């Protein structure tokens, strides 16, 4: 006998990227982590917090982070809400806006967690297909019964493509509901949508420190929205959702913009090399604005290639999409990791 709600029993749940065993020598190029260590300032900040002690609750509003992030992003601190990773932010937004029976809209293919969040609420989800240029048409903004929230990952995963901010603003202004622009990968891109929050109160931008700041193991994210949105989200936020270590570390991370610029520049160079080399092997590679590349092949099935890489110690993400096709999403690693990955791709194609 199950005691869960029927929608929980019926759902599959979100399945994260495969994780190697602790101590394994497998190279992870499947979950879009940063291949380099975080800023040394982060390590010093964590040491300071530990020396101060962990016996007291943290600041429930992560004020130090919000103040510094506001300066970096050019928004007031009270336009920022922090969470235990941006996934918690996405969860809070879904809880706040979407009730049982409501409709949540998302692009396809994109981040599969969005659909899971709708299922948890007992809500419906509607997937709107990207066109061949990874753009969204009028059907994404069309009114629909019960439509309460829409997600737009920008840059998108798995494609790494980005819709320009001017087009995003047009989408938001036509939307009959709030539009969450998920900017998990935006620091690797040429532009961002933060300024749209000031122009349209339906725009909510979510960010994470997992990718560009190399803090995936820490769990810290935030969103930027107009104050009335932030005030509503505070009502449902867990009281102490961000711990003292993550607040201290994330504040130090966002303060070190010189480290961020250097790290992002290095990854962008490696991204270009990975994409060019994959194309030379015969893959079709979408121009990426993220820290990964999306590879398809005109004639070769990709699952055997994925399995060949896995057998030889390289994990990439094999992602088949119904009605769309299959692809390999390959995270940008170090130059040495990329060299091994490319050699294995070439080897697999010869089989």
Predicted features along the sequence, with ranges:
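Generic structural signal for small/hydrophobic residues in well-ordered secondary structure
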Residues: 8, 29, 69, 80, ...
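PLP-dependent enzyme catalytic core of the Aspartate aminotransferase-like
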Residues: 308-312, 317, 321-351
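PLP-dependent aminotransferase class I/II
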Residues: 61, 202-286
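Conserved PLP-binding catalytic core of the aspartate aminotransferase-like
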Residues: 268, 280-312, 328
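Active-site phosphate-binding strand-loop segment of PLP-dependent enzymes
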Residues: 126, 130-187
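Phosphate-binding glycine-rich loop
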Residues: 63-103, 121, 299
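A short linear hydrophobic-aromatic micro-motif
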Residues: 78, 205, 281-284, 314-319
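N-terminal "arm"/small-domain region of PLP-dependent enzymes with the aminotransferase-like
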Residues: 1-56, 146
């Amino acid at each position: 006998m199950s005691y869960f709600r029927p929608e929980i029993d019926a759902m599959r749940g979100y399945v994260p990227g495969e994780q190697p065993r602790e101590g394994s020598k497998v190279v992870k190029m499947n979950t879009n982590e940063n291949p380099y260590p975080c800023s040394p300032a982060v390590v010093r900040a964590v040491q300071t917090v530990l020396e101060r002690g962990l016996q007291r609750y943290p600041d429930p509003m992560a004020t130090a982070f919000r103040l510094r992030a506001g300066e970096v992003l050019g928004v007031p601190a009270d336009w920022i809400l922090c969470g235990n990773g941006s996934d918690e932010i996405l969860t809070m937004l879904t809880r706040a806006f979407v009730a049982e029976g409501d409709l949540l809209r998302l692009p396809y293919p994109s981040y599969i967690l969005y659909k899971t969040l709708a299922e948890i609420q007992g809500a419906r989800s509607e997937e709107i297909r990207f066109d061949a240029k990874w753009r969204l048409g009028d059907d994404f903004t069309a009114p629909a019964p019960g439509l309460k929230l829409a997600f737009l990952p920008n840059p998108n995963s798995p494609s790494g493509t980005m819709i320009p901010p001017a087009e995003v603003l047009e989408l938001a202004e036509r939307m009959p509901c709030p539009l969450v622009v998920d900017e998990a990968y935006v620091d690797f891109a040429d532009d961002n949508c933060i300024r749209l929050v000031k122009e349209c109160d339906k725009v909510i931008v979510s960010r994470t420190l997992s990718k560009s700041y190399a803090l995936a193991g820490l769990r810290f994210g935030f969103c930027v929205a107009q104050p009335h949105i932030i005030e509503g989200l505070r009502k449902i936020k867990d009281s102490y959702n961000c711990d003292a270590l993550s607040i201290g570390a994330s504040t130090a991370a966002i303060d070190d913009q010189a480290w961020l610029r250097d790290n992002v520049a290095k990854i962008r160079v490696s991204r270009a090399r990975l994409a060019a080399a994959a194309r030379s092997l015969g893959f079709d590679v979408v121009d990426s604005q993220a820290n990964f590349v999306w590879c398809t092949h005109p004639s070769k099935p990709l699952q055997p290639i994925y399995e060949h890489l896995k057998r030889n110690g390289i994990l990439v993400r094999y992602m088949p999409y119904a009605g769309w096709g299959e692809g390999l999403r390959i995270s940008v690693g170090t130059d040495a990791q990329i060299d091994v990955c490319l050699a294995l791709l070439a080897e697999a194609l010869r089989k």
